[in-house]
Amino acid sequence: MFFERPDAGETAVLVHVDFQDEQEREDAGEFLELVRSAGAEPATLLTGSRKRPDSRTFVGSGKLEELREAKAVHQAELVIFNHALSPSQERNLERELKCRVIDRTGLILDIFAQRARTHEGKLQVELAQLEYMSTRLVRGWTHLERQKGGIGLRGPGETQLETDRRLLRARIKAIHKRLDKVRSQRSQNRRARSRAEIPSVSLVGYTNAGKSTLFNALTTAEVYAADQLFATLDPTLRRVEIEDVGPVVLADTVGFIRHLPHKLVEAFRATLQEAAEASLLVHVIDAADPDRELNVDQVEGVLEEIGARDLPTLKVMNKIDLLDSAPRIERDGEGRPEVVWVSAQQGKGLELLAQALSECLADDIIDLELALAPEQGKLRAGLHELNAVREERFDEAGHSLLTVRLPRRDFLQLMARLGERADDYLPTTLQEKPVWEA
């Protein structure tokens, strides 16, 4: 990794500003958790209020002087802002304060770098870091030369900075190629599971909502779970048995956070695609968090960004032990499970969650008897490609008589791809049954 991270125990002065024009403000408490997760030691938190950021140093001259004094009093080596800084603001602040300055994006990137355990996760974090740093490259990064052999690589008349920028671009391009291979392999794996009719369930949620604890409780897997932000970064897949459904692939994905940097969403697209193509999303929510509604909005915003906003979703209100609340299932107007209240830590309500998962996934499977004319060969081929055909025979007129079983979502996607109306093939009872909504 090519990123200057806070050293363990490094003393930091923190800055949090409320802007009057902002509808959605950062959370100072969450900011402190982020700083501690990165390994820095918060010395003091300076707060303030402004109409808008100062274009040169983000804060005004008075707050800048406060920062100088706080840095001197606490002998801080680092200043961390709970906001996104422009490259020029970051440079100007470093000149004024004579120390390193990190913004919220850099802080989150650092935590991701520490949490990445697999080769894929490390590549994705490195890509996000390099793209973030490409706009902040103002001094020689001679260690990049070692990636390419060093001497003899500089073009005629190139400065060290120009050389480093070129090497940085080359490294970014190389990582993109490697991640393209990862995406391709993941896509092949998902297609194989689809052909084998194995539904997939992805756990999503705000960071520290308890996804990994719930994942462990459902699978008896040993996924790292801790009371800290971004304890899980790399996706973990496990096969579990769900009553009335059979084998199901359960995926634990990276936690989301307020104002998750766009570059991270892009870099982790291969990982997040597990959620985007799931048969069912399980949105894990910290029921005891006073900001839970805001957190739900943030998660749904990221899901929309990766094209997963409209997938079938079951909400799980976790940590009910902190509310002294009882496990239960809440259902929608048509009797389908909508919300399950559980405590993954104490194992309460897990049998209700298993029941809800069974209902949700069994509800998604459809059985059809189809008679297809010879000119409907594309539809017949598509159903065979999905491994959905259980029996096929032909009548005297040459029609293909198919017995079909497949996830309803796969059938609707096939119909959309072929430009056909799904209702023309579905029984009336299935036509009236709407596609699951989040």
Question: Each PLM stretch: what is its role?
Answer:
Residues 1-109, 423-438:
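N-terminal accessory targeting/assembly segments
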Residues 1-14, 32, 135-209, 215-216, ...:
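C-terminal-of-GTPase-core extension/linker across diverse P-loop GTPases
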Residues 3, 184-186, 192-199, 217-249, ...:
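Switch I (effector-binding) loop of TRAFAC-class P-loop GTPase G-domains
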Residues 14-18, 45-48, 80-82, 283-286, ...:
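Conserved beta-strand segments of the P-loop GTPase G domain that flank and frequently precede/overlap
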Residues 18-23, 52-57, 115-120, 159-160, ...:
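Flexible beta-alpha connector loops of hexameric P-loop NTPases
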Residues 26-36, 41, 64-73, 83-99, ...:
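Conserved C-terminal guanine-recognition region of P-loop GTPase G domains, centered on the G4
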Residues 105-109, 229-230, 344-346:
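Short, acidic/turn-prone active-site loops that include or flank metal/cofactor-
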Residues 106-125:
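Short alpha-helix plus adjacent loop in nuclease-associated cores
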